[in-house]
Amino acid sequence: MKIEHSTFNVQRPMSNDTTLKGQQKIAKGVSPGSLKKSLVTGGAGFIGSHIVEALLKRGDRVTVLDNLSTGRKENLDLLEGRDEIDFHQVDIADYESIKDHFRGVDQVFHIAALADIVPSIRMPFAYHHSNVDGTISVLEAARAAGVKRLVYAASSSCYGIPDNYPTPETAPARPQYPYALTKYVGEQYVLHWGDIYDLPVVALRFFNVYGPRSRTSGTYGAVFGIFLAQKLAGKPYTVVGDGSQTRDFTFVTDVVAACLSAADSDIRQESMNVASGNPVSVNRLVELLGGEVVHIPKRPGEPDCTYADTTKINKLLGWEPKITIEEGVNILLENIDYWRNAPVWNPESIAEATEDWFRYLS
């Protein structure tokens, strides 16, 4: 299948329907019948593919830009038979390759980025190219095309280890590693373009997003993908430290609703937290998944807690999370086969993969 600079042709539906489970609760931000033209960078990735799906559901024409370095074409297979989606395999940092795709676009959802901690320590140039240069390229393309709104996927990692919980948007930025730094620098560019060039922008700081289609690549990363692959393999969960650390896990459809609400609002030049506002311990996650555990050393540079103050987004957009952790875990278990071919981590392979983490962040 030729995909570069061509209409994306969906080939088959996914074996598990991840579109309906849990998405009945994303009413805010999804208004069927809107006739917008939207563009999603990173639209074949985890969060991006869910945004694409929601945009099509409400009646948009959608352009997807993704270089497939971490995204998967299979994440868009469920859109079988839809001719309202155009897919282009391009590097967002290549301005000349992407600029024409922004013509006539109303809303841009800039989700594309290189993620994960360890690879960013090992490959800082690559992360700057994707997350900073790529963001500037997207901003310039949006500005040149006269795009009406741009929503940027910022990261809660900008807070580092905060002084206060719940953590408000006014907390100081203390990025602990190159990924966090590049996402924060990208956010500052977005807000700067909004101020200088009058481009209507909103930055949403995502907290610990999870849900169907979360990444299954070989990089050691988010806890849900690791645990689900271990559960499928009948292996113990590798719990960092004593498991008492808490995370503000936020279900992906709640994140999608926040993105669409921000895009459809008149709010501009603002950064807002997007989170459940209900931190859950890793031990509680293990309890919900069921299974044995093995403990591995606690890592430097990781907060004991992530816990967002969501007062601002609730006040400005009326957004509130809908999916509880219990509901979210049940949805993941119903779709667990998605992680069938994901790598199965053990204490030894994790120690090897995180060697640079301890070396540079200790």
Which residue stretches match the model-derived regions?
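Arg/Gly-rich low-complexity intrinsically disordered repeat tracts
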Residues: 2-21
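N-terminal Rossmann-like NAD(P)+-binding domain of SDR-like oxidoreductases, especially those catalyzing
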Residues: 16-209, 253, 331, 335, ...
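Glycine-rich Rossmann NAD(P)(H)-binding loop
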Residues: 41, 209-213, 239-250, 272-280, ...
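Hydrophobic "lid"/C-terminal helical patch
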Residues: 51, 259-263, 286-289, 329-336
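Residue-level signal for the nucleotide or nucleotide-sugar donor/cofactor binding architecture
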Residues: 71, 93, 122, 130-133, ...
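Glycine/proline-rich active-site loop of Rossmann-fold NAD(P)-dependent oxidoreductases
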Residues: 184, 209-225, 233-235, 240, ...
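Conserved C-terminal active-site "lid" loop/helix of NAD(P)H-dependent oxidoreductases
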Residues: 252, 283-284, 299-321, 327-331, ...
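Mid/C-terminal beta-alpha module of Rossmann-like enzyme folds, strongest
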Residues: 265-300, 309-310
